[in-house]
């Protein structure tokens, strides 16, 4: 497979794909915007604390590999970045909105079950039911230009198998280390995380509104 992203490159591309859909008014992103998105505490696994120089290095590498491009509009002195990873004018990788949502969520959080993916990808694409999630995953696993995802062996005590993207190479199919989060139902945890994301994004808007009313 021609895609071989490092963990940091996958995080950067995942962030740009996410923000392109969820906050189009702020897209393309500046370096600071990418840093904030990469270090976001919600909908990220693992949570990172990348410096601006670390992010800039990843951006430069991805531009050289033609996965990103710089944008500098008239009167705009700040360089911004947009993704060319998929659905770009001259790119080979074409994905549906449902496929973009699933791949983005896998890039940002690693291996997940279909139920977790449906909840966590909801802000990018609203799946009608679990059957649509599973059929989209199967399409990604069986594409002629892929595969782009793989189904992992079901972990002991789990009802669903997890899926992982293949943009960083082959995946070692090993059970995850047991931790406290395994005691929580995956679907419920994903719903709570989705709500936390919405609250985190609504708070700045509320603060701005309150400040405006106070003037």
From Swiss-Prot:
The modification N6-acetyllysine is found at residue 80. Keywords: Acetylation. The keyword Nucleus does not apply. Gene3D superfamilies: Winged helix-like DNA-binding domain superfamily/Winged helix DNA-binding domain (1.10.10.10). It comes from the Bacteria. Transmembrane segments: none annotated. Belongs to the UPF0502 family. This is UPF0502 protein YceH. It comes from Shigella boydii serotype 18 (strain CDC 3083-94 / BS512).
């Amino acid at each position: 497979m021609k895609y071989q992203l490092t963990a940091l490159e996958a995080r950067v591309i995942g962030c740009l794909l996410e923000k392109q859909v969820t906050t189009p008014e702020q897209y393309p992103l500046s370096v600071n915007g990418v840093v904030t998105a990469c270090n976001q505490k919600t909908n990220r696994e693992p949570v990172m604390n990348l410096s601006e120089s670390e992010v800039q290095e990843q951006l430069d590498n991805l531009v050289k590999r033609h996965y990103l491009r710089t944008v500098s509009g008239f009167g705009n002195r700040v360089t911004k970045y947009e993704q060319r990873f998929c659905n770009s004018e001259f790119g080979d990788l074409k994905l549906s909105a449902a496929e973009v949502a699933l791949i983005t969520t896998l890039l940002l959080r690693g291996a997940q079950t279909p139920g977790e993916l449906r909840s966590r990808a909801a802000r990018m694409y609203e799946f009608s039911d679990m059957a649509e999630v599973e059929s989209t995953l199967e399409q990604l696993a069986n594409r002629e230009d892929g595969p782009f995802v793989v189904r992992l062996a079901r972990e002991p005590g789990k009802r669903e198998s997890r899926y992982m993207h293949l943009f960083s190479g082959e995946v070692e199919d090993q059970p995850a280390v047991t931790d406290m989060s395994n005691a929580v139902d995956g679907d419920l945890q994903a719903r709570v995380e989705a709500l936390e994301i919405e609250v985190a994004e609504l708070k700045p808007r509320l603060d701005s509104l309150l400040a405006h009313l106070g003037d």
